[in-house]
Amino acid sequence: MVQFYLLTLVFIVVDRFAKLFAINVLRDLPNGIVLVPDWFKLMYAENLGIAFGLRLLPPEGILLLALAISAGLTWYVWISQNRSPLFILTFALILGGGLGNLIDRLIFGHVVDFIYFDIYQGTLFGKYVSLWPIFNIADACITIGACLLFFFHDKIFNPR
């Protein structure tokens, strides 16, 4: 269990430092920092919703849902007898990412996003679209954890 909590803490700390950089540096740069022209930049954004900026619930509902999921995930790992490295990594990524965004919601009332891949911006069927959202380290942790869960389900839950 110690490894799980330490790894979760590492993901939270990395996310916090990255978001502090976004707040202290990127917020004052309207065009962000271009790392690969026309493709990848760091750019400050405030996300009031959940994934892809969707606002399916009011802010209080999102906060309560995030708290419930984090508590449920912590409880599940606690009662599980599975201590395989892949199990610990997968759930530490998901919990660390979830708690990283939860901390933002508690402090700021929104999530700080700053990683932007400019895959396509333009008109599609007469409507302006941007095909990739701005995200953060916590979102990446959740996504990587979910992908591990999907692709390595049998290895995670049936370790040898």
Curated annotation (Swiss-Prot):
UniProt GO BP: proteolysis
A Pfam family of this chain: Peptidase_A8
EC nos: 3.4.23.36
Cited NCBIfam families: lspA (TIGR00077), PRK14787.1 (NF011368)
Stated family: Belongs to the peptidase A8 family.
Domain of life where this protein originates: Bacteria
PROSITE patterns xrefs: SPASE_II
Name of the molecule in the record: Lipoprotein signal peptidase
Stretches that traverse the bilayer: 59-79, 84-104, 132-152
Bilayer topology term: Multi-pass membrane protein
Pathway involvement of the protein, from the record: Protein modification; lipoprotein biosynthesis (signal peptide cleavage)
InterPro entries linked: Peptidase_A8
Molecular function GO labels: aspartic-type endopeptidase activity
Residue positions of the active site: D113, D139
Gene Ontology cellular-component terms listed: plasma membrane
Location of this chain's protein in the cell: Cell inner membrane
Alphabetically ordered keywords of this record: Aspartyl protease, Cell inner membrane, Cell membrane, Hydrolase, Membrane, Protease, Transmembrane, Transmembrane helix
Annotated catalysed reactions: Release of signal peptides from bacterial membrane prolipoproteins. Hydrolyzes -Xaa-Yaa-Zaa-|-(S,diacylglyceryl)Cys-, in which Xaa is hydrophobic (preferably Leu), and Yaa (Ala or Ser) and Zaa (Gly or Ala) have small, neutral side chains
Role: This protein specifically catalyzes the removal of signal peptides from prolipoproteins.
